[in-house]
Amino acid sequence: MKFDPPLETVTLLRRYKRFMADVVRADGSEITVHCPNTGSMKNCVLGGPQQALISDSGNPKRKYRHTLEALQVAHGHWAGVNTARPNALVEEAVRAGQFPMLDSTSGVEREVKYGDSRFDLALGERADPHTFIEVKNVTLGPGPDDKDDGVIAFPDSVTERGQKHLQTLMDVVASGKRAVLFFCVQHSGATAARPADEIDARYGQLLREAIENGVEVLAWKSEVSAQCFRLKEPLPLDL
């Protein structure tokens, strides 16, 4: 996923009302941008001015023309905070054949229903996929006062929706189909991924149960820069 022109570097002043953020541009002007992230953004928004990257939709009629894409977080790392990006990154990589274990030759579909749930991606025919993929944006890294250990966690707040997805992924496996949970780790300091048991113990419990029941879990680190976002290397899962 290349950005041409590159993302604009600004200074984040504040995030508020969940979906809004105020930033200052290089010329000193202040604008409000869209913040597409429903999580707490713990250890991403640090509480004071910090470097950020924004994209421009090019649409002057949009209420908030610009979108918050990434933040410089503790220890000088960057985290991608636009939760719409991981789905596109994973789909792009699957279609490009980056993951031999996720063969796209039979087709790649978006937003596919299974029961009363909807998964981000599926492989095979839309009416009868053989593989369901749920993608998660993983950004919870160490804070400013924490050791920079490179272990990035999910979720950053209690997620009943995420818990439901894990239960449905287990149902998928029980039905004879393949289920994959893909942790897209948008954090430049990442060396491993883990469940954030201290935030959502139930999610961690269900994740381990899902793995025991045949759900496949992949974790990949994404490059986060003004020029491009791309999945670059697999990460170990610290359970």
Swiss-Prot record:
Enumerate the Gene3D superfamilies for this protein.
2.40.50.580, 3.40.1350.60
User: Where in this chain does the entry annotate a coiled-coil region?
Assistant: none
GO molecular function terms noted in the UniProt entry: DNA binding
List the InterPro entries.
SfsA, SfsA_C, SfsA_N
Pfam families per record: SfsA, SfsA_N
- Name the domain of life: Bacteria
Family (UniProt): Belongs to the SfsA family.
Q: Which HAMAP family match?
A: SfsA
User: What is the official name of this protein in its record?
Assistant: Sugar fermentation stimulation protein homolog
Q: What is the lineage of its organism?
A: Bacteria, Pseudomonadati, Pseudomonadota, Gammaproteobacteria, Oceanospirillales
Gene this protein is translated from: sfsA
